[in-house]
Amino acid sequence: MTDMTIPLTFTDAAAKKVKNLIIEEENQDLKLRVYITGGGCSGFQYGFTFDEKVNDGDLTIENDGVKLVIDPMSLQYLIGGTVDYTEGLEGSRFVVHNPNATTTCGCGSSFSI
């Protein structure tokens, strides 16, 4: 991605957690896929899964040797956002900080635009 602005930030904390999970799974082909689906209390919700494939049109962002993959439909809702990993009172989880969301539910897993 030379001379191209990356439309989504993949934090060091998220990359470190993905790297540790890949080591646990013993599968170096795994990538973290973030996606948007309809649902949740605000209309859309974030999803995370491990995937071995990168489909045509997917955006791949690499940090510390691990890859984050986003499909084109989901990317349009995530531009300018950040995929992070947090540990706190609510437990540990991957989170999306999305500047495009006009409302977000209390748990942060669903949003509306």
UniProtKB/Swiss-Prot annotation:
Keyword set includes Metal-binding: yes
Protein name as it appears in the record: Iron-sulfur cluster insertion protein ErpA
Positions that bind iron-sulfur cluster: C41, C105, C107
Organism annotation: Mannheimia succiniciproducens (strain KCTC 0769BP / MBEL55E)
Keyword Ligase: no
Cysteine-cysteine disulfides: none
Lineage: Bacteria, Pseudomonadati, Pseudomonadota, Gammaproteobacteria, Pasteurellales
InterPro entries, A to Z: FeS_biogenesis, FeS_cluster_insertion, FeS_cluster_insertion_CS, FeS_cluster_insertion_RrpA, HesB-like_dom_sf
Keywords of this entry: Iron, Iron-sulfur, Metal-binding
One Pfam family, short name: Fe-S_biosyn
Necessary cofactors: iron-sulfur cluster
